Amino acid sequence: MRKPLLFLPGPMQVPEQVRIAGDRPLFNHRSQQLLELLAKLESGCRPLFGTTGDVMFLASSGTGAMESAVVNLTSPGEEVIVVVGGTFAARWADIAKAYGLSVREVEADWRRGATLAQVEGALKGWPNARVIFHTWSESSTGVLNDMGEIGKLIRSQNKILVADAVSGLAVSPMSMDAWAIDAVVVGSQKGLMVSPGLGVVAIGPRAWQKSEQSKTPRFYFDWKKLKGNVPFTPALSLLLELDGALDFIQTQGMDKIFARRAQVADRIRELVRRSGMEVYALKPGNGITGVIPPKGFDMAALRRRLENDFGIQIAGGLGKVKDLMFRIGHVGHVTDEELDYFIHSFERCLTA
């Protein structure tokens, strides 16, 4: 069986250097060695988040990291605002409702993302809401939301902003502190170039203060337990992979990594447009390209042929745009050879 070439919104190919790092021998996780590894990982992640705050690692998916933010920053019955501009943004609302929160949803345009005016209106309409859950990079659409002005607006009203950056971190430059974001959640399987199963949370001082007031029951995802501690068995192999990934990023240089992500995104979007298709996101990030084909185009057949004939996997649409588009992922490391092969294979599927 041939190895699949992944052009998914995540996971993607794990670079050889990262895979080898994850294959290093395991060791006692109740040891100084692990504490030193966690300190190194935290130091390496801070520049990617653009923060001087704390960074913690969870044995969970990105959704687990999202849930950790909800339970640590809210109390039962509390009113919260969720900005919904895609399937994964809506997940914030689903998690919050599961914990008995009073959820106020702001419906953003799925192609353009949320506007400052929409968020300003929500803050005026629901003045009792103290926490706003937003999505920087929407994995279901490819939209990259502008967080800077929104963050400053929320900060000016002494409220807490939490952002999902699962498909944006290490793909596009992030400035958590400068954008006045109080907590950011991600998963390992996208821009960080690590296998799935590691949640990462960056936490600023205002989020810590809010967590001290939270009365939502929590155990596994209790940030206070996790800070500077290893209360549960960690995803050790994934932490070792992340160590390799951060070394890779530091060796390449963050600016070069971001430029490469943008270059790959540009080439794929050029392919989409010259194939007579449309890029779904009007404000796209560098990690995911949502594609609207011509009316009547068989998207399922394209995906089948790419996989069966060329060994390439791409993704379908999700939620209310499921039947409108498909998605090409390029959130992680893509070599020139892989990109050229993808473009050639995609064009073959359309012409043969």
Residues covered by each model-derived region:
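PLP-dependent enzyme catalytic core of the Aspartate aminotransferase-like
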Residues: 1, 320, 324-352
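A glycine-/small-polar-enriched, mobile loop at the entrance of the PLP active site in fold-type I
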Residues: 2-59, 63
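Active-site C-terminal subdomain of aminotransferase-like
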Residues: 13-14, 189-270
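Conserved PLP-dependent catalytic core of the aminotransferase class-I/II
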Residues: 40-49, 247-280, 305
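Conserved beta-loop-alpha segment that forms the PLP phosphate-binding cup at the N-terminus of a helix
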Residues: 52-81, 85, 89-93
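Active-site phosphate-binding strand-loop segment of PLP-dependent enzymes
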Residues: 114-170
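Conserved active-site segment immediately N-terminal to the catalytic lysine
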Residues: 177-189
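Conserved PLP-binding catalytic core of the aspartate aminotransferase-like
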Residues: 278-309
